[in-house]
Amino acid sequence: MNIMFKFVGNLNYNTTKNMENIDWANLKFGYMPTDYNVRCYYRNGKWGEIEVSSSDVINIHMAATALHYGQEAFEGMKAFRCPDGKIRAFRIKDNAERLQSTCRGILMPELPTELFEEMVKKVVKLNERFVPPYESGASLYIRPLLIGTGAQVGVHPADEYLFMIFVSPVGPYFKGGFATNDYVIIREYDRAAPLGTGCYKVGGNYAASLAANKMAHDAGYASEFYLDAKEKKYIDECGAANFFGIKEGKYITPKSSSILPSITNRSLQQLAKDLGMEVEVRPIPEEELSTFEEAGACGTAAVISPIRKIDDLENHKSYVISKDGKPGPWSEKLYTHLRAIQYGTEPDVHGWTTVIE
């Protein structure tokens, strides 16, 4: 496809941001204004040209379907400044394909992979001064967002859409970084219905998790831990991340239609195979938690968050997975290999990274 760019609004650098005052090594996982974002509108049945904007606000119709009927999808990915001086983004195409799956699920127009990739490259390049230095351990978080902007009062798909990408430098999702965390099983809330939108990355799934997440935090846990919504027997997700368990040289992760297919989890499965592990994707009953030698939550934000224990307060059980409170050897190997690929210090034999030029 023929991709065109145009600049809109005031395109000067964000001069209020003094780069020398950024403490790269102690960044939180949060929003920081950067210089530019990129946008593309879908109108009259086709995608338009890419717009580059320095404004961090959008104008939206009060009857837009994104506001009333949940026509909203997003992705999460990262770019890294590497020791060789290059900037690499991780698995752009896979994020494009997952967004396309979400679009099919909630009846939004699919964004062509080529357009998605070009916009990711453009927004990272425009904001390259905000990509944290390698030694900081931080990264540039990339947030693609697609919303229905067309007005509807009845429950119908919009006829117009806005796709945009903004970026923000971020530190670790959990304060301790690659360190063990405690989780608690929450049965009072479900993240997603069995035949609902759990396998799509839509905002409604995260809104449904807010109350459970607050309960977990108020009780002193890192995050909530979900069982399946239908029977409350099988492991679903760790808050906003996928679960994996390790035992007897096997990497085991849940199989469920209500779980978001994590690109990080898929990467870890491949790396586990590369390390000689067996990989099993299958339903995992809650009781099996007591048999795991290691376990973790995985996703773009956290990468791997090793699990120390999972408490089932309702049944007065505690599944202690890390006896010494430290990440297990397999988790450490997987984390080290994945980070090495992302930072370009290990050969990218699977073609996961894209150098931003």
Regions found by a protein language model. Name each.
Residues 132-147:
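Extended, Lys/Arg-enriched charged tracts that mediate electrostatic binding to polyanionic substrates
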Residues 2-123, 145, 152-357:
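Helix-start/capping segments and mature chain N-termini
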